Regions:
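Short, solvent-exposed segments of well-ordered alpha helices
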Residues: 5-16, 36, 55-65, 80, ...
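Amphipathic alpha-helical binding modules
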Residues: 68-107
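Amphipathic alpha-helical interaction modules
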Residues: 23-70
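Short terminal alpha-helical segments
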Residues: 1-39, 90-99
Length: 107
């Protein structure tokens, strides 16, 4: 895949990074459950996805936009009674990142 700086990055490298982000998103669940800070890791994930989007000028806005919206929305799900919504949203994010991986493989 070509960056906006005209630098070619192998698809496998991008896929590995997306899989790493997938794992980081999944780790937010036990972190929140155990009372460990999950907001800073979430901010880092959002930052990296924004950076990837900017760097690669992804043609996958139909995936990136809802992914970032859902991730940003996690910040509002802090109350104990919000955990099931938090969990559901995490799994929706995981599915969207999986969609990014599939699209990179197709190209």
């Amino acid at each position: 895949m070509n960056t906006k700086y005209n630098q070619e990055i192998q698809d496998e490298i991008i896929i590995k990074r997306l899989q790493y982000l997938l794992n980081q998103v999944y780790k937010l669940l036990p972190s929140r459950e155990e009372g460990i800070d999950w907001e800073k890791p979430l901010a880092t994930i959002i930052e990296e996805i924004n950076g990837m989007n900017s760097l690669f000028n992804f043609e996958l806005q139909s995936i990136i936009y809802p992914l970032l919206c859902k991730m940003e929305g996690l910040y509002s799900l802090k109350a104990p009674e919000d955990f099931s919504s938090f969990r559901r949203t995490i799994f929706e994010c995981l599915n969207l990142i999986g969609g990014l991986v599939k699209n990179v493989r197709i190209k």
